[in-house]
Amino acid sequence: MSEKTAVVLLQMGGPDSIAAVEPFLFNLFSDREIIKIGPALLQPFIARFICRRRAPKVEAYYEQIGGKSPIRELTEAQAKALETELGDGYRAFVAMRYWKPTTIDALAAIKREGISRVIALSLYPHYSRATAGSSINELKRVLGQAGVSFQVSYIDRFYDHPLYIKALAEKVEEGLSEFSDRSRVTLVFSAHSLPQSFIDDGDPYLSHIQATVRLVMERLGNIDYHLAFQSRAGPVKWLEPSTEEMMKRLATEGRKEMLMVPLSFVSDHIETLYEVDIQYAKEAKQLGIDKFRRSPSLNSSPLFIECLAELVKSVKGEG
């Protein structure tokens, strides 16, 4: 067996074509760790019905951002940069929860290379059973069926890692540089929403998000800021306020310059490229907000890659 260590980057994934939108949505809505729709035996059938109805609308969103999600290419670029940062002795792989390359694909590639030591690194900074939890459980399921023995370690959160906070603050500063007077700017941290029931059941996601915001603001200093939640889906109670509600409230208060800071996303995909850049930008204009911008995503930011490398080395005992 190879003495190298495999680092598996766990990410949500996204459709790589318009034709892939409906099957991607089916994979998402079939996952009972993220959403429970009826009895377990019926969920695939209900998910199929929901996806057929939702797909045309979602396909139109993807048409506006180039006909696919860029998340695979961006995550593979992160993997390549991480491999370079870590140096000899490491190989980085990508495992997408709801599309390709799948967890099975990643483990098959690791097996072909004869690697037995695996570090699974969730690219969700803030732990939730619906995101990092689901990806790790999928990895464990596949490992149980792999027919080969891997020595596996897991990294399931890094919401307060100093280099993550520094990288995020750096991107906010980049966004602020587009405004002539930062004292006039309102920051809106926009995190992916989650059903309130998850938090009520003890999921730490909200507390992790709040900690990240607090730590970033400690670096940025005295700037007006707010936290809101985007990407709701379905009739259940979600975390509040929604990003749209927050924008309306701030516009009513006379705020004219706004910088949106995506949280819980470490690379660009539909939540940043469509929801923020197109949908929220249009709403901002309708609300009378004169200047609306988004801070750049982390993607392969050198500081962020350094953060991931430190996380890996801390597990390996090299930190």
Curated annotation (Swiss-Prot):
It catalyses: heme b + 2 H(+) = protoporphyrin IX + Fe(2+). Fe cation binds at residues 192, 271. One of its GO terms (biological process) is heme biosynthetic process. Keywords: Cytoplasm, Heme biosynthesis, Iron, Lyase, Metal-binding, Porphyrin biosynthesis. InterPro entries: Ferrochelatase, Ferrochelatase_AS, Ferrochelatase_C, Ferrochelatase_N. It comes from the Bacteria. One of its GO terms (molecular function) is metal ion binding. Its EC number is 4.98.1.1. Its main location: cytoplasm. It is found in: Cytoplasm. One of its GO terms (cellular component) is cytoplasm. It holds the Pfam family Ferrochelatase. Pathway: Porphyrin-containing compound metabolism; protoheme biosynthesis; protoheme from protoporphyrin-IX: step 1/1. HAMAP family: Ferrochelatase. NCBIfam families: hemH. Catalyzes the ferrous insertion into protoporphyrin IX. Belongs to the ferrochelatase family. This is Ferrochelatase. It comes from Geotalea daltonii (strain DSM 22248 / JCM 15807 / FRC-32) (Geobacter daltonii).
